[in-house]
Every structure is written in structure tokens, then in C-alpha cells.
Amino acid sequence: MASRTASGQGVAGVIWPPVVHYLNDLIGWRETYFYFGIFVLVTMVPLALLLRHKPVAASANRQHNAASKHGILGLSPNLVHGILCLATIGCCAAMAMPIVHLVSHATDLGFTSARAAELLSLLFGAAFFSRIAFGMLVDRIGGVRTLLIGSGCQAIMLLVFSVVESQIGFYIAAVLFGLGFDGIMPCYALIIRVLFPVTELGWRIAWQYLFAFFGMALGGWLGGAVFDLTGGYSHAFLVGAGFNMMNLALAGFIFVRQNRQGALRQAA
């Protein structure tokens, strides 16, 4: 359910880039932002009111999952959550590089702005299917394994973006990146759901997404800063791949601890 809900982001990514491109050419980017803000205001506020009812309180026997007096994965619960938050910064800083700068990178290589906008639509179109598929994968192999798969795919495609220059190569890379990156974020909510008590899910998931916003902002800014230093985006994508390695290392640590705790429980 989490992945199906989050897949709406992919649909939006298909619809909005060509619309924004058209409005930018017609009325300018400032006016485009203004009218988009009005659209968000008149649609999101009424839709949010549909969710105003408080959820049914969880029963007492559901308020404890993997958490116990021994901590989580043999560590402090807040330490585990901090590791997940840092992992989120790593993956989001990496994914922001192509999301924010792919259009500029393509136009620098000689693509028209319309073709460059198509790349973003292809990327998010693939992302829609990715979230559905990764949601099914989470149900089969768990959130941490799925996170490792998605993060690994994202790292590979960032390396590809740093070297590809042909139109067909960009189209293929955009689709494959979309298939990899967009299944990552729902994994964190599901990992937290498994590791932490139900009564802590709200604030822990909120913090997780706050760090995701920090990561996206960092990646978007850093991509531009690297461009200013090097005159191109290829090195920015390599920097993004480096952040992705940080994510893989932290997620791998959680995976190893989870397996170790599972083995200890079986031995006991």
C-alpha cells in the first residue's frame, strides 16, 4: 500500500515536466511557479482535509515489534534511527543530482529543451512502475534487502550518466535510473515499521523524510556547485555515486546486524 500511494509521484513526474516546459516558454519561469503554487493551494488543501480524522488507536499488543529492553539490532534505538537518517541523506543527495540537473546536462550536450524535458518524463514514468514493483519485492524479501537493490541500481546509473552522451543512451539511462531510484524511499518507512514500536512510527518516519529533504537539497545544491567548479555535470554525477556508496555502506550495516540478530534468536 505504501508503494502504491507513493507511486503518484511518478505519475506527476510524467505529467508536469512537459507542462512546465510549455508554460516556461509561454509566460516565463516566475509566472509558471506562481500559477503552479495556486494550483497546489486549491487542490492539496481540500484533499488534505479528507485525511483529518485521527487514526484508530493501536491495541496494546501491537505496540511492540522488534524493540525490547535489549534495544534494536543490539543497538540503541536512536542510534539505529540515526543510521537510517544518514543513509537517507546519502541516497537522496545522490538521486537529486540527475533529477535536478539532468535537463541542464542534456541541453549542455546539445539536446533541445523539449528533448531534455522528455528525459525527465521518461525517468518518472519508469519510477511509477518501479514503486509498484519494489512494493511487491518488499513483501517478498523485506525492506533492507530491497533498499540495497534499489540503491545499487541507482549507483550504477549515476556512473552511466557521467559518461553517456548519445540521445538513445540518455533515454535508456533515464528509464533504468527511474526503475532503480523511486523504489528506495518507501523502504525506509517499512524498515521503521518492522524495527520500531507502532507508537513511535509517526515521529520517526517524519524525521526520516525530513532528512530526505535535507539530502535532496544538498544534492541539488552540490550538483550546481560541482558544475561551477568543473564546467560540466559529469563530475557531479560521480559525486552523487559517492554519496550512494555511503548509503550502501550504512544499509549494509543494518542488513548485517539484522541477520546477526536473527541468527542469535534462532540459536536461543
Model-predicted regions and their roles:
Residues 153-165:
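C-terminal ends and interior cores of transmembrane alpha-helices
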Residues 79-136:
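Extracytoplasmic gate region of multi-pass secondary transporters
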Residues 1, 183-196:
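Intracellular juxtamembrane helix-capping segments at the cytosolic ends
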Residues 195-232, 240:
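A late C-terminal transmembrane helix in Major Facilitator Superfamily
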Residues 130-142, 227-228:
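Helix-to-loop junctions at the C-terminal end of transmembrane segments
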Residues 5, 9-55:
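Helix-loop-helix hairpin linking two adjacent transmembrane segments in secondary transporters
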Residues 157, 168-176:
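Paired small-residue
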